[in-house]
Amino acid sequence: MGKLIMSIDQRLQLIMRNTAEVITIDELRKKLESDEKLKGYIGFEPSGLFHIGWLIWTQKVKDLVEAGINMTLLRAAWHAWINDKLGGDMNLIKMAADYAVEVIKNYGVDVGKLNIVDADDIVKEKDYWALVIKVAKNASLARIKRALTIMGRRAEEAEIDASKLIYPAMQVSDIFYLDLDIALGGTDQRKAHMLARDVAEKMGKKKIVSIHTPLLVGLQGGQRMNITEGMEEDDIQAEIKMSKSKPESAIFVNDSREDVERKIMGAYCPKGVAENNPILQILKYIIFPRYNFVKIERDIKYGGDVEFKDYEELERTYIEGKIHPMDLKKTTARKLNEILEPIRKSLEKKPEFEEMIQKISKSVTR
């Protein structure tokens, strides 16, 4: 039986599902209506262990491939090195890139349909560095410094070393060099994508559509320990998001079933509260996209099992106080472990990754 052909509206709906924003929807529709083979990408820093927050953009890569977008996965080792990841150990950074691709494959993305590119190959090209300089010439120093939040750093941290100032221009140059129609990233990449759109007009380059996925809040949820008045939204998101540098705030794809259960059961999940609730976010962005429905299993004296066909219905019921946090957590742990099991099994079969995981665990930087 042949593969079903999706309409423009169906492709648009799939691409936009569970996104925080698309800049702009009209431009995306026009690109889809052009009937051209569209090129998209996501660049990722191989910077440590793969936590479940990354599964949000991994699912979106899967959606984009299904929607007929020719997706490139950029293994941004040089960017990770500039950003002082894994102690600047380039060999370890490259091992982390291999590990990430293995995770993406075992999550269910058809990596055979991805164009996997190493930053190593791009930076060897003299045309690339000429592009970096041209991008920098078309952006103010203040604009570049404001874009440092794409690295998980604040603008005032630009004084650490001068290489950090090259990073935003490199990311914009990646987009131009790969001749892309679509750039995918978390909401923390918004400033780089907006810079690319603005500079494109000045340089006569193709203006990308930028697709931003939400950042998964850490397991501490809305308990904002380091939030101060006057902080930009980017900095606030950086403080509360799930992060490799805060291991107890994160669930890693190679965590054991027991560790996943322990972390979920200890997570922030106040009764009837949806805002910054990590358990509800895991259900919305990771579990529901993989299943047609979710069953909350309960003892008959507490109302018995209840099924939900969409996230909105579940959230509404939770806010009304009709689902106990403990029942929600048990279901989340069970379904999340189902998703992570094939990833864990694959990693266990490759001893080189076990050694690398041990090294990375000792070397994780911000």
UniProtKB/Swiss-Prot annotation:
Question: TM spans, by residue?
Answer: none
Q: Which residues bind L-tyrosine?
A: 41, 167, 171, 174, 189
Q: Which GO terms describe its molecular function?
A: ATP binding; tyrosine-tRNA ligase activity
Q: Which Pfam families match?
A: tRNA-synt_1b
The answer on whether this UniProt entry bears the keyword Cell membrane reads: no
Keywords of this entry: Aminoacyl-tRNA synthetase, ATP-binding, Cytoplasm, Ligase, Nucleotide-binding, Protein biosynthesis
Q: Which reaction does it catalyse?
A: tRNA(Tyr) + L-tyrosine + ATP = L-tyrosyl-tRNA(Tyr) + AMP + diphosphate + H(+)
GO cellular component terms given for this protein: cytoplasm
Q: Where is this motif: 'KMSKS' region?
A: 241-245
Instruction: Name the domain of life this protein comes from.
Output: Archaea
- Alphabetical list of InterPro entries matching this protein: aa-tRNA-synth_Ic, Rossmann-like_a/b/a_fold, Tyr-tRNA-ligase, Tyr-tRNA-ligase_4, Tyr-tRNA-ligase_arc/euk-type, Tyr-tRNA_synthase
Q: What is its main location?
A: cytoplasm
Record bears the keyword Cytoplasm: yes
Family, per the entry? Belongs to the class-I aminoacyl-tRNA synthetase family. TyrS type 4 subfamily.
Q: What name does UniProt use for this protein?
A: Tyrosine--tRNA ligase
